[in-house]
Amino acid sequence: AYWQEQDGNNKEETMKYMKKLYENVLVLDSGARGATNTFVENGQGDVLVAWENEAFLSMEEYPNQYEIVTPSISILAQPSVAVVDQNAKEHGTTSLAEAYLEYLYSDEAQRLAGENYYRPSKEAILQEFSGQFDLDMNLVTIDDFGGWNQAHKDYFDDGEVFDQIYTE
């Protein structure tokens, strides 16, 4: 997101930058926790590109060993949460699952999220954590990439951007 914004959305320059970035990746773990473990616990690599919460947890677990460098532009990642109706019905947990989902967006749960280094989605609660989160960061969303369907088509379909970067 940063490089694309910096370079005026020039796709060729963005691809060059991303290829160069991936060329420097020692280990491409399958998930955020694995990448953090590889970097923090195994000492592999010079830089960890991570979720905010992973960076904050690393600082808490290993004080004075790392520095968080916050970009001016990043992606607001909003993982989906849903009740899987058929599964909940089969296990008799529909009301419990729905209650959890409703609670997840309550002020109390949003504060718990912030206390555990997750960026609250409610603006008023996020403001309470202004000392923790950079509130001036330009956060792009999936909509800036044309929505999920378009982003998947442009970046993750066979032969598209990710394949071009990763396989060359």
PLM ranges: what are they?
Residues 1-2, 98:
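Residues on a specific face of well-ordered alpha-helices
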Residues 2-71:
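Ligand-binding pocket segment of bilobal, Venus flytrap-like solute-binding proteins
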Residues 34-38, 83-85, 118-121:
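N-terminal low-complexity, Ser/Thr/acidic repeat segments characteristic of secreted
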Residues 53-56, 73-76, 87-89, 118:
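Solvent-exposed loop/turn segments at secondary-structure junctions
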Residues 60-62, 73, 129-134:
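A generic structural signal for short, solvent-exposed coil/turn residues
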Residues 77-81:
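Small-molecule pocket liners
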Residues 88-168:
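Extracellular/periplasmic juxtamembrane helices and adjacent flexible linkers that interface
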